[in-house]
Regions:
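C-terminal interaction-tip segments
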Residues: 1-21, 133-159, 226-239
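Extended, low-complexity, turn-rich repeat/linker tracts enriched in Gly/Pro/Ser/Thr and Asp/Glu
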Residues: 52-63, 151-156
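Short edge-strand/loop segments of extracellular domains
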Residues: 66-80
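Extended, solvent-exposed segments with strong compositional bias
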Residues: 89-135
Length: 239
């Protein structure tokens, strides 16, 4: 039988701004179950490329560790597994029967000034076997991935809202740090209270971030802002 290889689409899990507002410690939940689809049928997970943004400080401090991945399938097709617990806290639901495997981070495989991790699966060779009829479309199966801190991850931001920019404008006035040091066009920005500001369209300068549309919520002076997708994952499979 012919062997095939393929990659998942880019997975951008939600890392809540309120969870990024404090540093993580080893074992903390970085992001809860996030769904992804792959071509229908059983597949072997060979590895993952995990891109992790730097800390939001003046030095763009590189993250000192990676993320351990857990995999699950829903209790019934297309049903999200039970939450692992509160983000930036310990797992409280390790007993879930939905979990089907794990892939530890390989810290020695890290490289790049913005921290790019290339991790390989353990010798157990994780195989993802789907529920029947999962996935939103014919020909695909749905699984879920969650991430636990493999060390002292720290996404804390030093960028604050300047004044009280209103919802009648697309410009978010900021101060204290140039957001361009750790944010990019296309990032979805929330404030520290998990209030949506918008999706970045352009950086006019170090104090002005223009969103793709008017601000979703009015800014609150001195509130810190965060990119809610500081981690991107591409999974590598064999069929």
């Amino acid at each position: 039988m012919k062997t095939g290889y393929f990659n998942s689409s880019v997975i951008k899990p939600l890392v809540k701004a309120s969870a990024q507002h404090a540093a993580f410690v080893t074992g903390d939940i970085v992001f809860d179950w996030t769904g992804f689809e792959i071509p229908r049928g059983t597949a072997k997970l060979l590895g993952a490329t995990i891109k992790i943004r730097s800390k939001g400080d003046s030095g763009s401090t590189v993250q000192p560790a990676g993320v351990n991945l857990l995999f699950a399938k829903g209790p019934v097709p297309d049903a999200t597994p039970t939450s692992l617990g509160t983000a930036n806290g310990e797992v409280t639901n390790f007993a879930s029967t939905d979990i089907i495997g794990a892939m530890p981070s390989a810290a020695a495989d890290s490289f790049g000034l913005r921290t790019l991790y290339q991790s390989t699966v353990s010798s157990s060779e994780l195989v993802l076997e789907p529920n029947g009829n999962s996935g939103a479309n014919i020909g695909v199966d749905k699984f879920y991935v969650a991430g636990l801190a493999a060390g002292a991850l720290d996404f804390r931001s030093a960028v604050t809202v300047d004044g009280t920019p209103g919802t009648g404008q697309a410009n978010l006035d900021v101060e204290d740090l140039d957001p361009d040091l750790f944010m990019v066009v296309g990032d979805v920005v929330h404030d520290e209270d998990d209030r949506l500001m918008g999706t970045i369209s352009v950086f006019t300068d170090a104090n002005n971030v223009v969103m793709a549309a008017n601000l979703a919520n009015a800014g609150v002076n001195d509130k810190l802002i965060y990119n809610i997708n500081p981690i991107e994952i591409i999974l590598h499979f064999q069929k």
